Structure formats: structure tokens, C-alpha cells
Amino acid sequence: MMELSTRTLGDWLEHWALTTPDKEYIVYSDRNLRFTWKQFNERVDHMAKGLLAIGVKRGTHVGIWAGNVPDWLTFLYACAKIGAVAVTVNTNYKQAELEYLCQNSDMHTLCIVNGDHGNDDYVNMVYAMLPELKTSQRGYLKSKRFPCMKNVIYIGPEKYRGMYNTAEILLLGCNIDDDELLEAKAKVNCHDTVNMQYTSGTTGFPKGVMLTHYNISNNGFLTGEHMKFTSDDKLCVCVPLFHCFGVVLATMNCLTHGCTQVMVERFDPLLVLASVHKERCTALYGVPTMFIAELNHPMFDMFDMSSLRTGIMAGSLCPVELMKRVEEKMFMKVTSVYGLTEASPGMTASRIDDSFDVRCNTVGRDFEFTEVKVIDPETGEECPIGVQGEMCNKGYNTMKGYYKNPEATAEVIDRNGFLHSGDLGVKDEEGNYRITGRIKDMIIRGGENIYPREIEEFLYQMEGIKDVQVAGIPSKKYGEAVGAFIILHEGVEMNEFDIRDFCDGKIARYKIPKYIFFVNEFPMTGSGKIQKFKLKDVGLELCRKQGIEII
């Protein structure tokens, strides 16, 4: 029978280290690096003792700023075993974002690698943030701007002034008695915060979402159950670990099912195909653009994908044609998960047994042990079947809250315990949900409510349009007017009159975009989400440059 577990992340790791000690857990196929459950658990214990040696304890905030490197998960579980909180840092962050997060999270220890995108020099960014580091003895950092910050660890063998490296942390751990580690482990409770993730800031400043062992291990377990995972599965993980998709839907699924996690350090379609082929992976995750890159790779046909059986496509609307190609060419029954970081993250999911139509056109049903409701934002009442409202969730997966921000927490979790997603959705007769837009994205033009998603989906039907976003542009006359931001396929030429002609007579006049902008890209967050709230400013700036009068 399916039930929620009160095991901590450390308990789960030790369970498999005892039950299946010699089974492979973490595999980096490209470098033939392999850890069994027993080996990995031992490395985690050594790292946990090393963290204790540098003053990390229960409740301490430890940042991990790295791609999917082998010791990323070692640090996550080492924190989990001693009750510390792993703060995941987006690898796309630049100086200002890093400083904001370190300050806001009261970070004590920061673990880094050097950036893998030519211009991202994490080491120098850290020195710019903590100039005292270059003249400090390791472990004795005193920063004026970041008084909580005491240590920086470089994940790897390289040595940098003022920073520990991994080998030194493991060595320091040898001085810590096993009893001290056991004592620290004994104090950890499944309802303690284990992971803090910063929301990507689609609506302003990022907030630290506090997630517990209970939140994420159970969400990962149920995600795996929806795809009928067993300990025989091998999941290829090419999505970033700093995001819920990687650390919960992937890592926690493997942790709670005792299966093998085949890691890809940084997304590369060729490396993904080679890893699936060589390791005989049974499942693969990705966002639509990743699957497109894999399918379109000129060497795709050289690899055997027949071992695959399932996986998750998430992150944005999954195109029907892409789903079909993945099922035909990669032999996978693709499922999708809808949620948000604040819901650990999964709220609804399609199941492997669902029909293609359900898996392709909906985000499935509620997760077990949760209550998902579509609520009318005006009245607070539950909407009838087929009527659009706000997607809300109550259950084991609701975050503990935003770090040091009770006001923002109270804004999203109501007095009945429902987490308000800010997303609009509808429920059908079978209990499956469709996401229809964002409440905050809604355009109010002269009293008419306009949902951008509806216009976007309509414009997608026009040949030549690769991507489109619709947002409100301030209007003196109507309050807001409809603005469409369009990316065209390569080689396609189109003007605003073509767009209006296409709309004419097919959608209501007030929904036809008044402002049409042809752009090369949209403003994005570090984790690849479109920042719709910035489109308004982009539109105003483009109007100014093009001499368009806003009325």
C-alpha cells in the first residue's frame, strides 16, 4: 500500500547501503565514475564529519553553487545527515544575484566549482564578494558585508587562497569521532528544513523556499510511483540539480526507490544519448528543448534507445508533435508533472498508464495525499468542473514557508492551509487538470479580462511563428492594451499587418494585439523561465525606439 514515509534523507541512504550495498547508485558514464550505495554512503559520512569540523551544525546554511558535479550530491546528503540546510544556487547567477542570495539566506559555508560557461568565473566572483578571503586563514573568515559567512569550499582538488578544497574537508573529518556524527544524526527530524531553493523571481525578488525531508522525499517517491519505478530502473539525469526537477523529481525518486542515477554533468545531447546507450537507462527526464536537441542530433540513429520505457517532460507546455516523436523514436511513455518550488514541487502528474491524450494535453491528476482545488480568485469558492480558477494545493508537500519572510508566506498560504500557485487552471470530468495561464499575467483592457495564454495558443497556429508571448502594455485609454512579442522561424518574413489579418474575424476584436513586436529573445530567469512582468517594460522601450505613440 502507498504511504508517506517519515525517513530522513540520511535514513534512506543508509537503508539502501545496508539492503543493497553493492548495487550501483551514482554513475558518471563519460568518465566511468561509479559509486555503489555503500561506497557513496561512506563518502557522505566522511564529508559530513568534515563539515562538522568546520563548524557546520544543525540549522547551518550551506550553499552549493555548481553544475551536476560528482560531489554535488555528496554535499547535499552530508548536510542532510547532520541537520544542516543545503541552499541550492542557480549556476546562471551573476555577481549581484549571488550576493543577494548569500545575504538573504544567512549563508555560513559556500561550496563552489569554477563556472563552465567561459565568462562565469565563480572563484573571482566569490573573491569580489568576499575580498577578505584572500588574506584570511581558512575557516577564519570575517566579512563585513556577510557576517554569517565563515567558509568557502572549492569542490575539487584545486587550491585557492582562503578556501578549503574537497580533500581538506575529508581530511579534517578524520579528526571527528564517529560518535559525534551519530549524535548529530540522532537530532535530525523529518520535518526539519533540509533544502532551501530560491524562487526564480518571475514576480520580483527571489525568496528562499524552505523544504523539509518529509516534503521532498515523499514527493520524489510518489513521482516514481506514477511511472512504476523499481530498484531495477536507471534514470538518466541531465536536468540541473539546483532546480526541483533535478533534486526532487529525479534524485529523491532514485533515493526512495533504490535505483541507479546516471548523471550528466552539463547538458549535452550527445552525452545524454551516449549515457542512455551505454548504461541501458530505462528513464530520461528533460524540458522540451532538451528532447528536441537529442532527437535532432545528427548522430541520433547511432545510439540504441530501446532500453528506455518512461520519463518526464516538464518545464513548459509540451508540444504534441514532440511528444509523439519521443514516444516513437525513444520508446518512452512520457509523463508530465505540474507544480512549483513551494509545493516541493509536484502538485499534479500524469501517470504512465494514462492515455496519450491525457499525458499530452493535461498535467494529470492530484498527487496522492494532497488536496488540489481550482478556486475562484474573486470569491474564494471552488470552481465547478470546466471553469477556470486558481490552482491551489494542500498537503504534505506544502513548503514550511519563505525564509525570514512570514508576510510573503501568508500571502500564498491561506488560513485553510491552501497554497495558492498564482496559476490558472481547469479540471475536467476525469479529474485531470489543464494549466491555462497566470493570474498576474491577466490583462484588463477597459474592464475586459484577457488571458495571454489564449491569444498565444491562437497565434501559435500561424505558420512562421516559432514562439510568442503576450503581455499587457499600459494604456491611458483602456488601462492596458494587448502586446504580442513574436520570435519568427529562421528565414521567415512577416509584419504586424499579417498578424492582425490572421486574427481578424477569428478572435474578439479587443483580444487582437494592438502592439506587435518582432524580437529575437524574451527576458528569462536564471533557470530558463520567461519573465513576463519584464515584457511590459520591453514593450514600452520598443515603442519609444520605434516612435510609436502609446494611447
Predicted regions and their residues:
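Conserved pre-ATP/AMP-binding loop-to-beta segment of ANL
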Residues: 21-24, 145-149, 153-160, 164-198, ...
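AMP-binding/adenylate-forming catalytic core of the ANL superfamily
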Residues: 93-103, 114-115, 284, 395, ...
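Conserved AMP-binding/adenylation subdomain of ANL enzymes
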Residues: 217-234, 242-283, 291-293, 297-299
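Conserved AMP-binding A3 loop
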Residues: 34-38, 185-187, 191-218
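Gly/Ser/Thr-rich phosphate-binding loop
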Residues: 171, 278-286, 295-358, 371
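Structural core segment of the AMP-binding/adenylate-forming
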Residues: 82-171, 490-492
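AMP-dependent adenylate-forming
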Residues: 12-36, 156-160
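Conserved AMP-binding/adenylate-forming core of the ANL superfamily
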Residues: 25-77, 94-99, 103, 165-174, ...
